[in-house]
């Protein structure tokens, strides 16, 4: 009887250790995956906004680097802006 109980208790102990370790590693792995996902997302958005010039800033007409609107050439200077047209009624 004692010889049968010892292996059963040992197996239960090892299974409990394995389950605890699996839960711990899953949480730790999930955190690192979430962290790397945030890094990828941040680099994606930084690439989208890189080189974007705000309204009124100097721009290159051939590069299309304005955040909003387009690159307008006004009095020998190129600036980002939105061209509004006035319509008379």
Curated annotation (Swiss-Prot):
Taxonomic superkingdom: Eukaryota
Keyword Disulfide bond: yes
Disulfide partners: 52-67, 59-71, 66-80
Compartment list: Secreted
Keywords: Disulfide bond, Knottin, Secreted, Signal, Toxin
Record flagged with keyword DNA damage: no
Tissue-by-tissue expression: Expressed by the venom duct.
GO cellular component, one term: extracellular region
Protein name: Conotoxin Lt6.5
Organism for this UniProt entry: Conus litteratus
